[in-house]
């Protein structure tokens, strides 16, 4: 539900800008390396039997932005992995498990950038789960497709900051380096560290939502088409 008002706000802003002034266009090719997590209160409450471990994921894609001076709006289309890692001890037996989500991501955001290229961004991201794979090691090793236990899609709120610097003054190509943080708005559902569905009332009488979270480093190249370069200074 949150995505719709954000989309309408971005579209209204874009139309308003286009009627009042010429705009700059930013085309970006980028990748991001993330620390990724899937948080659920029922897992958190299970102590040493189910514990979180650092998970890592990445994505890559293309972005398009519209800019007027310091203010801009943008969107991206990305493909990537969001992985959640777990570890625990059952009957003195250690185990480790992983949930690997293959996702399509559509972030929409507002961006504020000064003349030095430093920027701050905030918005929301639509995440489509293309596939979910669960694996467990040491304790009864298993690998299974758990896509049916996850929501078809979920959304996250995002904030980020970084810098966009031109490589050469004579070339409208910049190097982008930044950090982006995300946290789940909608329930991603899913399985626990054992691979059991989190909506199974036999194991979890009190249902708890699953929140996807990530923190990562953005690296990319941005090509700028600036219709008022001399006037704006960007």
PLM regions and their residue ranges:
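Short glycine/proline- and aromatic-enriched beta-strand/turn motifs that initiate or cap beta-hairpins
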Residues: 21-76, 222-229, 234
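Extracellular/periplasm-exposed beta-strand and loop segments of Gram-negative cell-envelope proteins
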Residues: 36-55, 78-101, 128-155, 186-197, ...
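Outer-membrane beta-barrel pore domains and translocons
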Residues: 30-36, 78-80, 125-127, 178-184, ...
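Positively charged n-region of N-terminal signal peptides that target proteins for export
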Residues: 1-6, 22
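Sec/Tat signal peptide C-region and signal peptidase I cleavage site
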Residues: 15-21
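Sec-dependent N-terminal signal peptides
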Residues: 5-15
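Predominantly the C-terminal beta-signal and adjacent terminal strand-loop region
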Residues: 152-234
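Gram-negative (and chloroplast) outer-membrane scaffold detector with strong preference
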Residues: 63-140, 149-175
């Amino acid at each position: 539900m949150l995505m719709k008002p954000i989309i309408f706000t971005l579209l209204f802003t874009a139309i308003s800008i286009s009627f009042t002034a010429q705009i700059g266009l930013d085309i970006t090719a980028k990748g991001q390396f993330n620390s990724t997590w899937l948080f659920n209160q029922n897992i958190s409450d299970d102590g040493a039997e189910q514990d979180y471990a650092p998970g890592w994921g990445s994505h890559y894609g293309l972005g398009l932005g519209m800019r007027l001076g310091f203010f801009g709006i943008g969107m991206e289309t990305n493909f990537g992995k969001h992985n959640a890692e777990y570890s625990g001890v059952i009957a003195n037996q250690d185990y480790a498990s992983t949930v690997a989500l293959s996702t399509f991501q559509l972030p929409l955001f507002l961006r504020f950038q000064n003349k030095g290229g430093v920027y701050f961004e905030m918005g929301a991201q639509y995440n489509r789960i293309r596939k979910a794979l669960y694996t467990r090691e040491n304790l009864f090793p298993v690998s299974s497709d758990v896509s049916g236990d996850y929501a078809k899609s979920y959304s996250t709120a995002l904030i980020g900051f970084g810098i966009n610097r031109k490589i050469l003054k004579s070339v409208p190509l910049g190097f982008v380096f930044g950090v982006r943080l995300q946290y789940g708005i909608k329930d991603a559902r899913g399985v626990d560290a054992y691979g059991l569905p989190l909506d199974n009332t036999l194991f979890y009488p009190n249902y708890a939502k699953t929140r996807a979270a990530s923190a990562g480093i953005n690296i990319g190249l941005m090509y700028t088409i600036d219709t008022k370069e001399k006037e704006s200074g960007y």
